[in-house]
Amino acid sequence: MAKGQSLQDPFLNALRRERIPVSIYLVNGIKLQGQVESFDQFVILLKNTVSQMVYKHAISTVVPARPVAHHTAPAAGDSDSQSEE
């Protein structure tokens, strides 16, 4: 499993399970809002008044409406996850 997936999947899964409203900003500046209905390696299905399939490569930022408890343990040797300056 790729390192990126180990962060994405638990985060998106928590958003889906808890039905947390999200704002998704695309690389072209467009803001989409809704709830994560499902996702896979390449797309997120976002539900609002309609369902939209959003390609992950077009996403800049995912902003939850409230804090998300996504239980991920830092990988061994991942020094920047706990560092403070």
From Swiss-Prot:
GO terms for biological process: regulation of DNA-templated transcription; regulation of RNA stability; regulation of translation, ncRNA-mediated. GO terms for cellular component: cytosol. InterPro entries: Hfq, LSM_dom_sf, Sm. Signal peptide: none annotated. PROSITE patterns: SM. One of its GO terms (molecular function) is RNA binding. Keywords: RNA-binding, Stress response. Disulfide bonds: none annotated. The keyword Electron transport does not apply. Residues 9-68 form the Sm domain. Belongs to the Hfq family. RNA chaperone that binds small regulatory RNA (sRNAs) and mRNAs to facilitate mRNA translational regulation in response to envelope stress, environmental stress and changes in metabolite concentrations. Also binds with high specificity to tRNAs. Homohexamer. PANTHER family: RNA-BINDING PROTEIN HFQ. HAMAP family: Hfq. This is RNA-binding protein Hfq. It comes from Tolumonas auensis (strain DSM 9187 / NBRC 110442 / TA 4). The gene is hfq.
